[in-house]
Structures are given as structure tokens and as C-alpha cells.
Amino acid sequence: MSVKKISEAILGVGVDDTTIDLFESQYPVPTGVSYNSYVILDEKTAILDTVDARATEPWLENLTEALAGRKPDYLVVSHMEPDHGANIAKLAALYPEMQVVGNAKTFLYMDQFFGADAIAKERRVVVKDGESLSLGAHTLTFVFAPMVHWPEVMVEYEETEK
């Protein structure tokens, strides 16, 4: 597998899937798709999004390589659609001290997808539009983008490296 160095602190751990021929079971993708996921290594470590279930194993290999023995402090969930969030519960089980960051609608959908017990309430960090999360030298600011695709979509702006 391959971890992609974005910067000294930001690594791409996503997976290219060249075996899929239809995106969302309807749109032809002759060269496949990319499931994007990132790790930010700082005083606190954050994982941005997971990947589709069909890419779990190579993604976990990339993640293990990128973390290099560290445990993640946060999983930031930008979007709950399965190609972005299929591994949320699995990752939460692998790292029981990791907190999960999302907005209120994110957790509503998460409970519907994985069950209300998948992510304990005390592990949830509910953010509002415009709020920030400091990782140390890097800060994530959350910007809501409802209905860009789904109602709970948000994006993260990393203020240090832009």
C-alpha cells in the first residue's frame, strides 16, 4: 500500500479502488474511484474520514504505517455516506480511547447506521459550524456544507498549512 506525504504532518492514507465499475451503483467509473482519508500528526493525532468497506484492509495498512505506533486522538467524520464512513465503528473498536468528531446530524446518522451503542456518548465531540479543534500546531475549522451531497456534510479547513 502507499501512504502519500502531503506535508511533514499531513499524510494521505486513502485507497484507490480500480475494481469498481459503477459509483453509487449507477455512474460508470472506468478508471475506478479514490476513497480519500488523511492523518494529521501533531500533539494530537487526527484521522479525517474512513473509507468504503471494500477498501478496509489496505486502508488499515496505510493507517498503521502513517500512525507509526501512535494512537489516534480523533476521528473526524465529514460525511456519513458508506464510501466515506463504512469503517467508523471498526476504527472506534480498534482505538477505544479515540474521540469521534462530527456535527449533530452526523451522530444521528451514525446511530442509524451502526446502532446507538457503537460510539459511546462520552466519546462524541459535537461541533458547530465555524468551531475549531486544535491539534497543537494545526487547527481544524469546521464548515458545514449541508446538501452538497447529504444533509450532514461538513468540511475541515486546516489553518496552518492551508
Q: Where in the sequence are the language-model features?
A:
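Conserved beta-strand hairpin/beta-sheet module of binuclear metal-dependent hydrolase folds
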Residues: 3-65, 155-158, 162
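Structured beta->alpha junctions
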Residues: 44, 51-52, 80, 106, ...
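Metallo-beta-lactamase
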Residues: 4-8, 102-153
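Short catalytic-loop micro-motif centered on adjacent basic/acidic residues
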Residues: 46-49, 73-77, 142
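Active-site metal-binding motif and surrounding structural segment of the metallo-beta-lactamase
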Residues: 54-101
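Short coil/turn connectors at secondary-structure junctions
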Residues: 43-44, 71, 96-97, 119-122, ...
